[in-house]
Each structure stands twice: as C-alpha cells, then as structure tokens.
A protein has these predicted regions:
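Membrane-interface extramembranous regions
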Residues: 1-144
Length: 144
C-alpha cells in the first residue's frame, strides 16, 4: 500500500472507531437519562448523538470525501463541546433542552466518551486536511 493510502485508512478507521465508542457510550447511557427532560429528554439527545456518530463514522469509512470529514468533525466537536459545557457550567434548561449540568466525570463512560470525541475531532480534522486538499488543483487539471 502507498504511504498516502495507509494514512488515509488509519485516519478513516481511527475516526470511525472513535465515533463508534462515542455512539456505544451514548446508547448505553441513554435509558438512565430518559427521566431528565423538559420537552426533549436527555436520553433522547443521547440517542440522537449516537445515531449521528454512527452515520458520520460510516460516511468516513465508505465515502471519505471532504463532506464526510466535515460531518465527522461537526458531530465529534459538538459532542465534546456539549459534555465540556455541561460538566463545567450550570446552564440550566434551554428551551426544549433539559438541565443537563453534571458536575462530575464519575459517570461510567462519560470520560471515555469525551476522550473518544476529542480523538475524533483531531482525526477528522486531519482527515479533512488530507482528503480535502488538492480539490482545486484536480478541478483545474480536469478543465485544462
């Protein structure tokens, strides 16, 4: 395999694995958080996060285009931002969202999910650089 092919596969598999861990943790925790609700329960939000992580991971594996890397980056960065925000800031309920403040890392899987989301942010960002670069150059070659 060519060096760029190995790099591509490493980034794709790594990003998908990190998003898979994120999805597994959120799926596992969702039932325990169903009682925490305003209009939407925290468990429902966890299931949405899990679904988005699965889709983004599959996109990166199956179709490693810039749009797939952007999706993976947005899902992982959004998840990481949410867990950090609600860990350190008591935001309270926001519209249909429940009060998700949880001043601890002791919840089983919470820290693992945060690490996985952080890894996915880095890997998806690198994937976007690797797979997103050169698009204009390829387009120019096709036009000439």
């Amino acid at each position: 395999l060519a060096r760029s092919s190995i790099t591509s596969w490493t980034l794709r598999v790594g990003t998908a694995a990190a998003l898979g861990i994120d999805a597994a943790v959120h799926t596992h925790l969702a039932p325990a958080y169903d009682p925490v609700k305003a209009t939407v329960s925290q468990g429902q939000l966890f299931r949405v996060e899990a679904g988005l992580a699965i889709v983004a991971g599959l996109l990166v594996l199956i179709r490693p285009r810039p749009s797939s890397w952007i999706a993976a980056l947005l899902v992982s960065a959004g998840g990481l931002a949410a867990v950090l925000l609600y860990r350190y800031v008591d935001v309270g309920p926001l519209g249909p969202l429940p009060d998700m403040y949880e001043n601890t890392w002791q919840v089983p899987g919470k820290l693992l999910s945060a690490y996985a989301e952080g890894a996915a942010v880095v890997l998806a960002g690198l994937g976007l650089l690797v797979h997103g670069g050169g698009t204009r150059a390829r387009a120019k070659r096709r036009l000439s």
